[in-house]
A protein has these predicted regions:
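Short beta-strand-to-loop acidic/aromatic patch adjacent to the donor-nucleotide binding site
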Residues: 96-112
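Short, high-confidence coil segments that cap the C-terminus of an alpha-helix
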Residues: 29, 97-99, 129-132
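Active-site-proximal specificity loops/subdomain of glycosyltransferases
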Residues: 37-100
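Short, well-formed alpha-helical segments that are part of the catalytic scaffolds
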Residues: 13-28, 34-36, 45
């Protein structure tokens, strides 16, 4: 029987948000694999999130009747690619390759709308039989209009819509050797013949690209990234600035990464 396995990567997140993320995952997932850890360039000295965050993850999963695997270790991750690759490695320990699906959320996201679990699984089964390897969901991102003085002033003067909506890939058929190469949204894996397949990325010339489907019912994810506190937002922006200054992420043809 097909299983949907949730994958969650986080660092120093609100326990309330984490509990909401895990509880919402249980609406479509049988098991969740959670990875805690800081990027090396992130402006903080701690290596692991607080134990209260770990308890929130475990308790929310257990209360929701969902299996849970939590991995936390006292070291940093070089970059986003290495951490996400580790998450895929952990997920593949739980998944039946080329049969089960991964559903990915971040610690600042919550699944707010979706069909009943069996309906989602049936849709994913049908997609897999049709050769589909990636299925999208709808993402809502809403900013807090009063997070800063500038936003408050803008909100008072202009009729600004603070919600952004887009389609984003979130369900991934589990492939052997799933990993992230080059840049943080370049996912690759191996099909049943051992051929490297691009699951998500920029290489439009790649001949081995996974087949995508635009939706899986009305699955809607709310992203709360812009609702964080001012200091956390500053730390995030500092990390991205340092990451880009170091040129840690590169875009090039897929075959060059594996050369």
């Amino acid at each position: 029987m097909t299983r949907v396995i949730g994958l969650l990567s986080f660092w120093d997140e609100s326990p309330t948000w984490l509990a909401a993320t895990l509880a919402s995952m249980a609406r479509v997932c049988d098991h969740a694999v959670v990875l805690d850890g800081r990027y090396a360039l992130y402006p903080d000295q701690r290596l692991q999130s607080g134990s209260h965050e770990h308890y929130a993850v475990i308790d929310a999963a257990r209360a929701s009747g969902m299996g849970i695997t939590l991995h936390t270790a006292p070291h940093t991750y070089t970059d986003e690619m290495s951490k996400r690759t580790k998450l895929f490695q952990l997920g593949l320990c739980e998944a039946e390759t080329h049969t089960d699906w991964f559903f990915i959320l971040d610690g600042d996201e919550v699944l707010v709308e979706c069909p009943p679990k069996q309906q989602v699984v049936d849709a994913l089964d049908a997609y897999r039989e049709d050769g589909v390897g990636v299925v999208s969901a709808t993402l809502w991102e809403k900013a807090d209009p009063h997070q800063s003085e500038l936003r408050t002033e803008t909100n008072m003067k202009l009729a600004t819509d603070w919600r952004y909506e887009c389609s984003t890939p979130r369900f991934w058929l589990s492939h052997a050797n799933m990993r992230v190469v080059g840049y943080h949204y370049n996912y690759v894996g191996e099909d049943e013949l051992g051929t490297t397949v691009e699951l998500w990325g920029h290489d439009s010339a790649c001949v081995n690209r996974a087949k995508w489907a635009s939706e899986c019912g009305s699955v809607i994810i709310e992203n709360r990234n812009r609702l964080r506190g001012i200091q956390r937002d500053k730390d995030r922006q500092q990390y991205y600035a340092d990451r880009d200054a170091c040129e840690m992420e590169t875009v090039k043809p897929l075959e060059e990464y594996d050369a």
